[in-house]
Amino acid sequence: SEMCIRDRPMDIPKLDPATVKYLDFSDVKGQENVKRAMEIAAAGGHNILMVGPPGAGKSMMSKRLPGILPDMTREEMLKSTEIYSVAGLTGKNNPIISARPFRAPHHTVSGAAMSGGGAVPRPGEISLAHNGVLFLDELPEFRKDVLEVLRQPLEDGEVTVSRVAGTETFPANFMLVCAMNPCKCGWYGHPSGRCRCSANEVRA
């Protein structure tokens, strides 16, 4: 017997970065110094660390950073789509990754989830952030071994994942944005004088 197999056409949207909608800096009132620092970081491709009390807007500003990065090129879109496809994160509703990725893993994330893993190696958070932003909120809360995972990709722009099934190297060229409180209670240096942390606690 014979079976006739036909291609099933699928509508692929045009690779047009102009159609991408980002959160906008114009939504944020004030914070001009922070906006300026983020503009400089975005223009130069620099990593950035924000330190401030709770409610200062660190997360809000970070989520708007992709909106001031350059539009993705066709090659960047295809590479990011390839990564997301391998991770099983593409589908009918999002066949093409045309927006700068913004990944914000929780501080309880494991090293394998950050770098990539599985019986068959799959991309982790740092590769899913390729061509975009990796945001680490509450930086001191991340485990040391998880932060160590960032060393190779920050230096080489890629990460190598070794498992029994084989070794894979995934792209991992991202802008690292970190945020943290200045002390355990979060209020050190605030004009309200609410901080009750000791000098040793602040240094820790």
Would you name each region that the model predicts?
Residues S26-A204:
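Conserved ASCE/P-loop NTPase catalytic core
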Residues D7-R8, A179:
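Acidic, proline/serine/threonine- and glycine-rich low-complexity intrinsically disordered segments
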